[in-house]
């Protein structure tokens, strides 16, 4: 978080957390889509690799599409297709022929900064990981230990149902996770106290102003100091 926000909040801390109730606020806003749609891409990650038996199944409609084999020397990536469905499956067989890492499957990709990726033999060829990027900022959704061996075939499968993600390696579940949609409250708030003061903190992360009334029960004749911090959009 921004330095000035942290400084302001750390200078205004109480010893006791107070009960806070709200009334009259709008319902939280759920952001984004309830499905993961976009480009599907396959990559040989710091290795030479072959990909075949590539198939995408739209489980919602029953439509099945197959694709040509792929082969990369010393890395490479290809767009397989784009899908807009709430339930689908991506299947392929992968084999590393040289190199020291593994494979990556990109899905739900709208651009290079907004996507989800499945690493098979990621981070020094030591894991199977599902990672989501939003505006270039990455988050690990699920991680397990796994290594890719040269010359060995791996039957890989990704299933996406709504925002539920499950990956399989050779028929066994490798990752299971949910890429949850952000939920934005109208106002975030807390209150605390010490021997002399009551501290009320409120944060509005929306792009519109909010007018609210603060009622402090059991306290008369309040003298208040208000500190307000605002800034420009991060975009």
Residue ranges with predicted function:
Residues 1, 207-210, 233-235:
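Flexible loop/turn segments at secondary-structure boundaries
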Residues 1-30, 181-187:
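Aromatic/acidic polysaccharide-binding cleft in carbohydrate-active enzymes
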Residues 16-19, 113-119, 231-235:
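Acidic Ser/Thr/Pro-rich low-complexity disordered segments
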Residues 165-167, 214, 224-226:
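Short beta-strand elements bearing conserved aromatic residues within extracellular beta-rich modules
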Residues 220-235:
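Acidic, Ser/Thr/Pro-rich beta/coil linker or hinge segments at domain junctions
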């Amino acid at each position: 978080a921004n330095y000035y926000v942290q400084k302001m909040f750390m200078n205004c801390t109480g010893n006791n957390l107070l009960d806070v109730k709200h009334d009259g606020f709008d319902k939280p806003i759920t952001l984004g889509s309830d499905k993961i749609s976009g480009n599907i891409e396959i990559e040989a990650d710091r290795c030479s690799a072959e990909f075949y038996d590539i198939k995408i199944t739209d489980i919602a409609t029953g439509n099945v599409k197959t694709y040509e084999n792929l082969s990369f020397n010393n890395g490479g990536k290809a767009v397989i297709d784009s899908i807009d469905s709430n339930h689908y499956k991506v299947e392929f067989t992968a084999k590393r022929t040289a190199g020291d890492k593994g494979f990556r499957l990109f899905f739900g990709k709208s651009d290079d900064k907004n996507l989800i990726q499945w690493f098979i033999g990621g981070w020094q060829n030591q894991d199977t990981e599902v990672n989501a990027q939003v505006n270039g900022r990455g988050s690990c959704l699920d991680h397990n230990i796994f290594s890719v061996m040269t010359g060995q075939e791996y039957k890989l499968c990704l299933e996406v149902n709504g925002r539920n993600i499950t990956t399989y390696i050779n028929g066994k579940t490798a990752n299971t996770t949910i890429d949850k949609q952000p939920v934005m409250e109208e106002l975030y708030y807390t209150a605390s106290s010490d021997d002399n003061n009551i501290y009320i903190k409120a944060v509005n992360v929306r792009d519109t102003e909010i007018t609210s009334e603060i009622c402090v029960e059991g306290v008369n004749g309040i003298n208040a100091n208000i500190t307000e911090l605002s800034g420009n959009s991060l975009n």
